[in-house]
Swiss-Prot record:
Organism: Nautilus macromphalus
Record lineage: Eukaryota, Metazoa, Spiralia, Lophotrochozoa, Mollusca
Annotated protein name in UniProt: Uncharacterized protein SMPP17
Tissue-by-tissue expression: Nacreous layer of shell.
Length: 11
């Protein structure tokens, strides 16, 4: 999991 993907899920 990438940082951008993590942020997308956290949104």
């Amino acid at each position: 999991l990438s940082l951008q993907e993590f942020l997308g899920l956290w949104r």
